[in-house]
Structures are given as C-alpha cells and as structure tokens.
C-alpha cells in the first residue's frame, strides 16, 4: 500500500505518493515528520525555475532540519530510479549520506542528480501548483521574494482524498 502525503501551501495543494518499497527508511522519515507537524509553516527556501522547488527546513535557511533518526541518515539510491522529469520527489543533501528533513520536487528532467539524491516518491496530484511555484520571483540566492510556505502537511488515510 502506497503512502500519500498531502500538502496545503500558500499557493494551493498537492499530494505526493511515497515509494515505500524503494526507499523505506526515507519514506518512514518523511511520513513521520509530516504526521508530527514538522513541515507545517515551513517555507520553500529555494526555488529555481526549470529545476526544482525545495523546502523542509524549519529554520528557513537551507542549512537546518533533522531526521527522525537523529541528525542525518544514509542515502537509499537505486539505479532504476532517475530524475527523468517534473514531479520527482527527492531528498536534498549536502553530500553522501547527509539526509535530514529537506526535500525537493523537480520541475524538469535533472539527470545530473541521479545517483546523488535519494528519490522517494512523485507528485500524484497538484503538479500545477508546483509548476506555479517554479515561476515565483526570487532574489539572487534563489529565495522567493514573497514567502511560499507549507501551511499543513499530513499523511492521507486510506480511502480519503
């Protein structure tokens, strides 16, 4: 059974489907953080057009965030999962085995990320919201000029939309 996580954001809602069998540790971390309200009121601190939107850092700096396992945890990279297009859900990191709470959604194919970032899901619905996020005005550090944030993230129960 796939796990879905729904996000209500300042720009609309989207839902992601987690690849539990491909990246079990990453998916457990992500779903547990969402369930605990960890992602609520967290901004999208980095948005790069035609590349990706990134969030998951409660400090909003791009340098914070921790996992349910303590500080950082190892990659779950699979050769059969690639950043082939828009809507890929992947962990942000600062090098091998440095996963915490930050994640991104691709806006286009990003093959240079293959083998470097754990892919653990995809956008199931609301991709237009993600695409609109990718068009917001940003400053020189790729930070949105007007705040874009997650209002609420939650695990979708079976049978619920």
From Swiss-Prot:
**Is Isomerase among the key words of this record?**
yes
Q: Which InterPro entries match?
A: Cyclophilin-like_dom_sf, Cyclophilin-type_PPIase, Cyclophilin-type_PPIase_CS, Cyclophilin-type_PPIase_dom, Cyclophilin_A-like
Q: Where is the PPIase cyclophilin-type domain?
A: 1-155
Mind telling me which residue stretches traverse the membrane in this protein? none
Give the catalytic activity: [protein]-peptidylproline (omega=180) = [protein]-peptidylproline (omega=0)
Could you confirm whether the keyword Isomerase appears in this record? yes
EC number(s) reported in the record: 5.2.1.8
Question: A biological process (GO) annotation for this entry?
Answer: protein folding
* UniProt enzyme class: isomerase
Q: Which terms are listed as keywords in the entry? A: Isomerase, Rotamase
| Record function comment | PPIases accelerate the folding of proteins. It catalyzes the cis-trans isomerization of proline imidic peptide bonds in oligopeptides.
Please give the PANTHER family that the UniProt record associates with this protein.
PEPTIDYL-PROLYL CIS-TRANS ISOMERASE-RELATED, PEPTIDYLPROLYL ISOMERASE DOMAIN AND WD REPEAT-CONTAINING PROTEIN 1
Name of the protein described by the UniProt record? Peptidyl-prolyl cis-trans isomerase-like 1
Query: Which organism is this protein's natural source?
Result: Aspergillus oryzae (strain ATCC 42149 / RIB 40)
């Amino acid at each position: 059974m796939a796990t879905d996580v729904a996000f209500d954001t300042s720009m609309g809602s989207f839902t992601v489907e987690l690849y539990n069998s491909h990246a079990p540790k990453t998916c457990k971390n992500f779903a547990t953080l969402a369930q605990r309200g960890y992602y609520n009121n967290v901004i999208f601190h980095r948005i790069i057009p035609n590349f990706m939107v990134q969030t998951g850092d409660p400090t909003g700096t791009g340098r914070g965030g921790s996992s349910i396992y303590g500080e950082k945890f190892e990659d779950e990279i699979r050769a059969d999962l690639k950043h082939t297009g828009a809507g890929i859900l992947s962990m942000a990191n600062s090098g091998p085995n440095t996963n915490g709470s930050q994640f991104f959604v691709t806006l286009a194919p990003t093959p240079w990320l293959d083998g470097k970032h754990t892919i653990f899901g995809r956008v199931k619905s609301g991709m237009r919201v993600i695409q609109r996020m990718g068009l917001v005005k940003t400053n020189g550090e790729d930070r949105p000029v007007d705040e874009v944030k997650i209002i609420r993230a939650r695990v979708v129960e079976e049978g619920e939309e």
